Amino acid sequence: MFTRLLKHKTNVWIPGFCLFFILSPVAADPFEAGLRAMERKHYATAMRAWRGLAKEGVPQALNNIGHLYEQGYGVAQDYSEAMNWYKQAASKGLAEAEHNVGMLYNQGFGVAKNDQEAVKW
């Protein structure tokens, strides 16, 4: 009887344990969760996922929030706000964000058009 009960508990416990470890990295990475949300056009979910990381100063999260504002994905399009987020990411050395700041200066979106500033970034 004890052996049968132990076997039954093991049959339930082991698959559950394996499932936990398979799904843990997915749930544990808010950055990736934000990317998946973007792919599904769930922009508010992406914003929530990246906001927490942005508070921690994660450059790519700061940049991605800037992208949401630049494109108007899930928020009102706001180039000034996008510039703010891009500059925060750029200040942490993220080349992609530096490029984005330069592009906004080049196009005059959210700031006065300034070719010298565009080249600087």
Roles of regions detected by a PLM:
Residues 42, 55-58, 71-73, 78, ...:
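Short helix-capping/linker turns of helical repeat alpha-solenoids
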